[in-house]
Amino acid sequence: MTEVPWSVVPNGTDAAFLAGLGSLWGNSTVASTAAVSSSFQCALTKTGFQFYYLPAVYILVFIIGFLGNSVAIWMFVFHMKPWSGISVYMFNLALADFLYVLTLPALIFYYFNKTDWIFGDAMCKLQRFIFHVNLYGSILFLTCISAHRYSGVVYPLKSLGRLKKKNAIYVSVLVWLIVVVAISPILFYSGTGTRKNKTVTCYDTTSNDYLRSYFIYSMCTTVAMFCIPLVLILGCYGLIVKALIYNDLDNSPLRRKSIYLVIIVLTVFAVSYIPFHVMKTMNLRARLDFQTPEMCDFNDRVYATYQVTRGLASLNSCVDPILYFLAGDTFRRRLSRATRKASRRSEANLQSKSEEMTLNILSEFKQNGDTSL
């Protein structure tokens, strides 16, 4: 997050309010705090490690995420028909990841260019919008996958009607609508800004002018689209594990797929989503309320850690394809079949070309032999 220096007071209104309270109460501490807050700004981290760390992570995510999700989409479209309910959710998850990795080349260039954004304000807004759509779309689709697997394991007979592909399509459309509507304020809050050295930054949160309202929006989004889904997922997995323990499902495909699902999804949350949301909230709070000289070192560490978690948050686009491979026997089986078929086709083409080349050589040899006679 390369932004203008932090300030506790986006537009000066809060500082004037605090100073007025200090004068009214005769409290010099409040008044002096307001004066310091209105004039003092902690500098951002001086290490510049994000110029190297973030592009390196994004390059890795782009390569692995592009290949993995391209294969996943190809499999779902051409080799996974007819779809099951869980296939619908996985396809939408792969689509969200694929759309996100397509935006990474511009972001990689941005950091190699010392965070000087050259692609315009609209592209900056679109970049941040797609990141958040992928982030929360992935969380909600993982929640749908977890709830689907919970119904199939805990209530295998009662859930037969609810787990149909048609219902999964309706739920997926609803998820996309919820995410797009909930994330649309990002198009207002994000954008570009010009620094004192005339370079252009692309805010990954917002400028100081809208920081306080953005913090409220961010907290609402975090609770509604991260905390609640996390609680639902943990509840589903607790009941799945309980059902696997008490039911005789030793070595069954359902047991194996369920265990893989629990491990992968919880790993994604532990590595990507939880650290990002914790540090994003701490960073916003530091920009708002911890702007004093003695807090600058703390703010600097918070900011640096937040940059690390931003890279981690993008790793889900690499991990999700592993979910399709390990948690879906059908996907793994059909991928193996499609790979063998493509390999045989390639071998047949090579053999055909080799035979054609041999015949051409023999033909030329005979012609040359005839003319020499």
Swiss-Prot record:
Protein name: P2Y purinoceptor 1
Phenotype of the disrupted gene, per the record: Platelets from mutant mice are defective in ADP-mediated platelet aggregation, leading to prolonged bleeding time. Otherwise, mice have no visible phenotype and do not display spontaneous bleeding.
Keyword Cytoplasm applies: no
Localization in the cell: Cell membrane
Function statement: Receptor for extracellular adenine nucleotides such as ADP. In platelets, binding to ADP leads to mobilization of intracellular calcium ions via activation of phospholipase C, a change in platelet shape, and ultimately platelet aggregation.
Primary residence: membrane
Superkingdom classification of source: Eukaryota
PANTHER family: P2Y PURINOCEPTOR 1, PURINOCEPTOR-RELATED G-PROTEIN COUPLED RECEPTOR
Gene3D superfamilies named among the record's database cross-references: Rhodopsin 7-helix transmembrane proteins
Taxonomy of the source species: Eukaryota, Metazoa, Chordata, Craniata, Vertebrata
Residues the record lists as binding ADP: K46, Y203, D204, T205, N283, L284, R285, A286, R287, Y303, A304, T305, Y306, R310
Xref: SUPFAM superfamilies: Family A G protein-coupled receptor-like
GO cellular component: apical plasma membrane; basolateral plasma membrane; cell body; cilium; dendrite; glutamatergic synapse; plasma membrane; postsynaptic density
Disulfide-linked positions: C42-C296, C124-C202
Family of this protein: Belongs to the G-protein coupled receptor 1 family.
Biological source species: Mus musculus
Keyword Nucleotidyltransferase (UniProt): no
Extracellular topological intervals: 1-51, 110-125, 189-214, 285-303
Membrane-spanning residues: 52-74, 88-109, 126-147, 167-188, 215-237, 261-284, 304-325
Residue ranges that the UniProt entry lists as topological domain Cytoplasmic: 75-87, 148-166, 238-260, 326-373
Sites carrying sugar chains: N11, N27, N113, N197
GO molecular function annotations of the record: A1 adenosine receptor binding; ADP binding; ATP binding; G protein-coupled ADP receptor activity; G protein-coupled ATP receptor activity; protein heterodimerization activity; scaffold protein binding; signaling receptor regulator activity
